[in-house]
Design a protein with these regions (language model features):
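The conserved cystathionine-beta-synthase
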Residues: 7-22, 51-68
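Short coil/turn motifs at helix boundaries and re-entrant loops, enriched in small/polar
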Residues: 70, 86, 101
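Juxtadomain coupling helices with adjacent low-complexity linkers
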Residues: 95-101
Length: 101
């Protein structure tokens, strides 16, 4: 079973999702049952366009759309917290509908 979160759930609990990512988990974000992005830990030395978590939360839909083209580094007080990245083409989801709530 993979870590899958719906966009609506992410909007309500961004901090909890980032704590999970900080512990090393990768989370697949879905909208209407289809994967739209992944939220993963930041690799050492990795650099991307930086967006604060507050801005990400306010502009979640736009951030997900931008992440289709290129990864975005989410920052917390200026430090890299996670990466919002495109969905890998070979990703196969295994989840139950209850996981999306």
């Amino acid at each position: 079973m993979q870590n899958v979160i719906g966009i609506r759930t992410l909007r309500r609990s961004v901090n909890e999702a980032l704590l999970r990512v900080a512990r090393g988990e990768t989370i697949v974000l879905v909208r209407h049952g289809h994967p739209v992005a992944i939220l993963r830990p930041l690799a050492e030395g990795e650099t991307h366009r930086r967006v604060s978590v507050t801005t990400f939360r306010r502009n979640l839909r736009r951030a997900v759309l931008v992440s289709h083209r290129r990864p975005i580094m989410l920052t917390w007080y200026g430090d890299g917290a996670a990466v919002l990245a495109p969905v890998p083409p070979d990703l196969e989801l295994e989840y139950e509908e209850d996981d999306l709530r």
